[in-house]
A protein has these predicted regions:
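Conserved SF2 helicase motif VI
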Residues: 776-805
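Short, electropositive, low-hydrophobicity segments enriched in small/polar residues
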Residues: 59, 762, 789
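Helicase motor interdomain insertion/brace
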Residues: 1-48, 54-740, 749, 754-759, ...
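C-terminal substrate/ligand-recognition segments
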Residues: 746
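Conserved acidic functional residues
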Residues: 50-51, 772
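A short beta-strand element within the Helicase C-terminal
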Residues: 293, 759-773, 782, 815-818
């Protein structure tokens, strides 16, 4: 724990060297950011607020490298699902870090043997999950989960005065070997460190504040119990002291008691001159005062925060005024002054690159003659309520009535319904509340801070004489009528789902893929089932391959019946005949896969001769090949055999039933498959950066299980669902497959909380459908950012059009398609989202008066350009 950090001026020198040498691959914008960070980090922490998809992680990884080169240590705090991406970026930047730290068990495992020479505090860089401190501790918790605090206390006391605490040696609660060895290692390292070391001060405070034998009471470690903070600090001692703390997705978990906040304030121990580097595309989402929270995360002093808060508030007010009176010279002058003050207040702490500096967006602007923001097109998928069935008209009418009635009651159920709408749940979402799943949608419910809306006559509905509440209950009963008679299939006829299906299929027919976001699992699953059922019937009718041998479940059959009716296929659908047709075409598909199996090993080997794989991939391939060679042909043909599973994966990824696949395609697909199935350092038990035969064999056994789970699915994969229960490995497989232009899935349907961060889904898709639009523009920006990234399909298509000099037509754009019930609260929902989006753009995008607002002032083009030109600019290059 006695590392010698050379200081921030040395870090600055290393950063400048990286920008000049380009040892790490950097674009011009990233290099400009590093140059600015070299100026600012010696003085204070910094917020990197680059727009989604512009490469913030590469910048942060480069800073981590520079700090380590200067003798410092780095902690990187990331959402649980981003460990894979960070592992890649750190390796690209030449930074070695162990796998993301997720749990107490994993933390203690570092001390499973006494001779293990790499405790956490010896690592130069650590990646820690935001959820690391979400420990569920209470009276019945097993001792090893809380024993580190009393162990460290006891050992420090013994070290300091030569005596163990009373009855320590005979206490059976403190007999866990890992905990004992962890405490011994931590205390020994602290005792050997200088007197002024931060760990010395903290452990002495810990020894003063830890009660004995009170520290042996499990109940004292609960969420808000007395010893919980001290246990968190004890764990932090084992991580060591950090000179740089990087916080990814820093807009998340803003609450004081959130897991991320506890990590920052209790667990991560900072050196005296430590800096915080936060990363977020949306530092402010709904309220300009959220800047204050973000400044707090980079440890800005109170006086500077107060001054910044005042400037931010004044700017927000002046934006509102100048939008109302753009022709008023005094108002414009006041706006310019407040914009300058806003810029000065945040300039030392904020860097932001946005799409104005993106080469593809500049090309679009030059070719189209439109504003840079026009490369995105927002166009509603409108549902005409006049065309609905009488049952659905009544349901929509009831939902509208609820949105009105509940505004006028203060009772609990009314508040729930009102919050449902207030959190961005328009009419489509309000109806879908009926199909919320307590378990599968728990994270979404927690994120919304909205309780379950009762839809049955039960104790959840408060029986009261309140007439307004009774009216709300009556309207609620009307709203559920479409679902009462056909509970299993009603969602397949949901107007929002049908409208989305029509739009999605039209885009897929053009050879592109579609990303769909929604909130509730059951409607999303129904959308996936219906899309798959419709595509299955089309394939059967056209005698095309479909990766399914029979109809599997009654729910799937309900979707197929609905699809049969919607597609207006002739006659009554016979399940037996359909199963026969599926079996016949599936046999043809299996024959293709068998052909792949026969040549798979030789194809991959030939591909590897043309382009050598990394040692890790080669070691895993050798284990795979050996397992195949040791088994008979009969065993190899078994569906569970590794050869069969990998062949199925290759069939999907390479589209091997075409004649164009080459050995190089197979080899690259195997490399991609290994990358998706595992973390880069997974299986490397001895930490030497390579896989020996035993390590490779152990890892391959695990990868085979993951591959089997993904590629032995019984249903077709035209559309796939990603929700809270989707495993990390499956998410990576889905990302890999979705980013390939050919093959399934064509449609990825993602629950908002799961799919809006950490996934790059841009290589074959430029359209985002919002089944349940939000009211938080920051969330929508994150969703769109999955496809609006460097190297996207949109960029590729734009370059093709410009190169082909076809710019007379409509240029390709990023398409944003919210599903909206025309003439209902949904339209209000979308309008408010636009208003909030405009506020966000005024602070971060340089668009004070958006094209939507500018339509009100057709003769004020010059004044609007003047106003937008005066907007604050936090670009590292100083201009846009």
């Amino acid at each position: 724990m006695s590392q010698r950090f050379g200081g921030w001026n040395r870090v600055a020198d290393h950063l400048l060297s990286l920008t000049d040498s380009r040892v790490i691959q950097l674009n011009d914008g990233q290099a400009a950011s590093l140059r600015e960070l070299a100026k600012r980090l010696p003085n204070n922490g910094v917020i990197i607020a680059d727009e989604v998809g512009m490469g913030k992680t590469r910048i942060a990884a480069a800073v981590a490298r520079a700090v380590i080169a200067a003798g410092g240590r780095v902690a990187i705090l990331v959402p649980p699902g981003l460990g894979y991406q960070w592992s890649d970026e750190l390796q690209t930047a030449g930074v070695n870090a162990p796998p993301i730290l997720r749990s107490l068990w994993q933390y203690l495992q570092a001390w499973e043997t006494k001779d293990k020479d790499a405790p956490w505090f010896m690592e130069s860089a650590l990646v820690v999950s935001h959820a690391f401190t979400n420990w569920r501790l209470g009276e019945n918790t097993v001792p090893w989960r809380w024993a580190l605090l009393p162990e460290i206390y006891a050992r420090w006391r013994k070290q300091a005065n030569g005596r163990w605490p009373r009855d320590y040696c005979s206490n059976k609660m403190l007999d866990d070997v890992w905990v004992r060895q962890a405490a011994e290692s931590i205390v020994g390292a602290i005792y050997a460190s200088p007197e002024n070391h931060p760990t010395r001060k903290l452990i002495e405070e810990l020894a003063e504040s830890t009660p004995w034998p009170g520290a042996l009471t499990a109940g004292e470690y609960g969420r808000n119990a007395q010893l919980r903070p001290w246990l968190e600090r004890a764990v932090g001692l084992g991580l060591g002291v950090f000179d740089l703390v990087i916080v990814d997705e820093a807009h998340k978990s803003r609450g004081q008691d959130s897991g991320l906040n506890r990590l920052l304030t209790e667990v991560v121990l900072k050196s005296v001159n430590a800096r915080c580097l936060t990363m977020t595309a949306t530092p402010v989402e709904l309220d300009a005062t959220q800047w204050t929270q973000m400044l707090g995360r980079i440890r800005v002093d109170d006086a500077s925060k107060t001054a910044a808060t005042t400037a931010i508030s004044n700017y927000a007010k002046s934006v509102a005024r100048v939008r109302q009176c753009p022709s008023d010279e005094d108002v414009r002058k006041e706006f310019k002054e407040s914009a300058t003050a806003f810029k000065l207040a945040l300039n030392d702490y904020l860097l932001r690159r946005d799409k104005r500096q993106d080469p593809a967006v500049i090309n679009f602007q030059n070719a189209s003659g439109e504003g840079y923001h026009a490369y995105r097109r927002e166009q509603e998928i409108l549902i005409d309520t006049a065309q609905l069935s009488s049952e659905w008209k009544r349901a929509v009418c009831a939902a509208e009535a609820l949105s009105f009635v509940t505004r006028q009651s203060d009772r609990t159920v009314a508040k729930r319904l009102r919050l449902t709408l207030g959190n961005g749940h328009g009419i489509a979402s309000l109806i879908d509340q009926l199909h919320r799943d307590d378990k599968e949608d728990q994270k979404q419910i927690e994120a919304d801070h909205v309780s379950w809306i009762a839809t049955q006559h039960s104790s959840k509905i408060e029986l009261t004489a309140d007439k307004r509440l009774l009216r709300a209950e009556w309207w609620q009963n009307v709203m559920i009528q479409p679902f009462v008679k056909n509970a299993g299939s009603a969602l397949f006829d949901h107007p929002a789902i049908l409208a989305a299906v029509e739009e999605i299929e039209a885009i897929c027919l053009q050879g592109e893929k579609v990303l769909v976001f929604g909130r509730f699992t059951r409607p999303l699953r129904a959308l996936v089932q219906l899309l798959n059922a419709r595509e299955m019937l089309r394939c059967v009718d056209a005698n095309l391959p479909w990766p399914q041998s029979k109809v599997h479940e009654n729910e799937e059959w309900e979707a197929i019946l609905s699809a049969h009716r919607q597609l207006r296929r002739q006659g009554e659908l016979d399940r037996v005949l359909l199963d026969i047709a599926l079996a016949e075409q599936y046999q043809a598909l299996e024959n293709q896969r068998r052909n792949i199996r026969e040549k798979l090993i030789s194809h991959i080997e030939e591909g590897f001769t043309l382009k050598q794989p990394g040692k890790r991939v080669r070691a895993l391939f050798d284990v795979f090949k050996k397992a195949v060679e040791e088994d008979s042909e009969q065993v190899q043909g078994n569906e569970d055999h590794a050869l069969a599973v990998v062949a199925r994966a290759m069939h999907e990824l390479v589209q091997a039933y075409t004649e164009n696949s080459t050995p190089s395609d197979f080899a690259q697909a195997f490399v991609d498959l290994v990358a998706a199935a595992s973390d880069r350092d997974e299986g490397d038990a001895d930490g030497d950066g390579q896989l020996d035969e035993a390590e490779a064999s152990g890892l391959w056994a695990e990868l085979k299980i993951r591959l089997h789970e993904e590629y032995n699915r019984p249903e077709g994969g035209y559309a796939r669902l990603m929700f809270g229960e989707t495993k990390p490995a499956t998410r990576r497989f889905l990302q890999l497959a979705f980013n390939r232009k050919h093959g399934h899935p064509k449609v990825l349907v993602a629950q908002s909380l799961v799919g809006r961060e950490g996934l790059n889904l841009h290589k074959a898709c430029r359209t985002v459908v919002l089944l349940h639009p939000e009211w938080n523009p920051g969330v929508v920006e994150q969703q769109i950012g999955r496809v609006d990234r460097i190297g996207s399909l949109w960029e590729e298509k734009l370059n093709q059009v410009i190169a082909g000099k076809q710019v007379n037509g409509d240029l390709p754009r990023i398409e944003i398609r919210p599903v909206v019930f025309r003439g209902t609260y949904d339209e209000k929902n979308w309008q408010v989202l636009h208003d909030r989006w405009d506020d966000l753009r005024a602070q971060l995008h340089g668009i004070v008066i958006s094209p939507r607002i500018a339509e009100k002032y057709p003769d004020a083009e010059e004044m609007i350009a003047e106003i937008n030109g005066a907007a604050p600019n936090f670009s590292p290059s100083g201009s846009v």
